[in-house]
Amino acid sequence: MTDKLPLALFLMGPTASGKTELAIRLRQKFPVEIISVDSALIYKGMDIGTAKPDERELSLAPHRLIDILDPSESYSAADFRRDALQAMDDIVAEGKIPLLVGGTMLYYKALLEGLSPLPAANPEIRQQIEQEALTKGWSVLHDELKEIDPVSAARIHPNDPQRLSRALEVYRISGKTLTELTQTKGESLPYRVKQFAIAPKDRAELHRRIELRFDKMMEAGFEEEMKALYARKDLHPDLPSIRCVGYRQMWEYLDGECTRDEAVFRGVCATRQLAKRQITWLRSWDDLTWLDSDNIEQALETMSEAIASD
């Protein structure tokens, strides 16, 4: 049965590992179309701090699912799965192969395994939770979550109001915890998937790449990009867009919480931590072929052979 399913390629990896370069090279050799799997690239006007592919790169290899939302909006794993499946179907209908590229592991997981049947958001209950947070504080609500769902509470930081609110909301709507509901998996992906991950073999090299990229972003005008977002007045640090690595730290600088140099240092550290989490997740991933960032030619050959032999 799986032999009749269309082929899809996953190219995963930590930030600054060379995914975009490899994807563009691959598109120049094969009939693949790129779908971005990145929770930061979805936002318009957030180009420099997300290291979004530039005009030249996009002309060589257009990316779907970038620049689809305003930074004031939210986007869930369910939203991604819906949009990605539609994009994949469109690509296959054109006789091409979907190539999904990015580092948002939760999106890949949602796409592969489907989503558990969580209740839809309830604005009334959400408003009630936010009002409680104003009067009691999020730390008290986090303690409440510890009582009803210790597993989720261990994963959700007290300073993450979006996820904390959602966990409490799910329980109040359904009477079941987020942990209980997420153990029920949804519909699996109707594709034959070949999965690849690219990263430097040496962690110090990845750290060097991250620091270099952050410096280049600052030189390219990241501070000015951030100031434009800050000046809008309708954005705030609890939004998913502003919680993106780099943006949160630059917001703190513009808010007067730290100096510019401290913001850059914090941004680099936060990016390293993100990369570490991405690699940890990938190491537990099944059916994954690892590629070396320091040998793009070999990585290209490995992926090319996998496509040609299909």
Swiss-Prot record:
Monomer. It is an enzyme of class 2 (transferase). Coiled coil: none annotated. It comes from the Bacteria. Keywords: ATP-binding, Magnesium, Nucleotide-binding, Transferase, tRNA processing. GO terms for biological process: tRNA modification. NCBIfam families: miaA (TIGR00174). Catalyzes the transfer of a dimethylallyl group onto the adenine at position 37 in tRNAs that read codons beginning with uridine, leading to the formation of N6-(dimethylallyl)adenosine (i(6)A). ATP binds at residues 13-20. This is tRNA dimethylallyltransferase. Pfam families: IPPT. Substrate binds at residues 15-20.
